[in-house]
């Protein structure tokens, strides 16, 4: 069984990753991964994409057909266009309803497995010391503070350990995001400098002669 210290740290790490990446982005990634599995929902999504391609092809042909010069062809394409549009709207509504249910399920699972466990562990292991402080190294008020609310005096409580993990991980995440943003900005500025036109040597010489 993994140590409670490690369990708490991993949970806090997952929470920080979710906050940094974003719940919507995670839902989108899981949704795409789920659609790659051969399920009825994946089949439904594939049918919708295929129907959308058919609709766009008919719409393109309809726009290219004159209603005055080729009325019969235009009327046939119009009926086909309206039929495909109706079928596409139905399939799109069905997929969107499935996506809404999927997002609710993923959100509930993520909340229970992160925030729910995050709240449950201090209630269940509130009296259990995470580790003990060296005896006599810290004054009484420090020992009382780190053992708050129910851990034995002189030990570090699970609440304090959670707060310490959250603070450290937040600093690390902010530092990583800042470094990545700096690298990205440096690359973009480098590309912009490369795109700037450099004056030709002949043009410079011509300007010099004119000045003379």
Swiss-Prot record:
The keyword Coiled coil applies. The chain crosses the membrane at residues 5-24, 111-131, 156-172. Disulfide bonds: none annotated. Residues 1-4, 132-155 are lumenal. The keyword Transmembrane applies. One of its GO terms (cellular component) is GET complex. It is a multi-pass membrane protein. InterPro entries: Get1, Get1_fungi, Helix_hairpin_bin_sf. Keywords: Coiled coil, Endoplasmic reticulum, Membrane, Transmembrane, Transmembrane helix, Transport. It comes from the Eukaryota. Residues 188-212 are annotated as: Disordered. One of its GO terms (biological process) is tail-anchored membrane protein insertion into ER membrane. Residues 72-100 form a coiled coil. Gene3D superfamilies: Helix hairpin bin. It is found in: Endoplasmic reticulum membrane. Residues 25-110, 173-212 are cytoplasmic. GO terms for molecular function: protein-membrane adaptor activity. Required for the post-translational delivery of tail-anchored (TA) proteins to the endoplasmic reticulum. Acts as a membrane receptor for soluble GET3, which recognizes and selectively binds the transmembrane domain of TA proteins in the cytosol. HAMAP family: Get1 (MF_03113). Belongs to the WRB/GET1 family. Interacts with GET3. This is Protein GET1. It comes from Chaetomium globosum (strain ATCC 6205 / CBS 148.51 / DSM 1962 / NBRC 6347 / NRRL 1970).
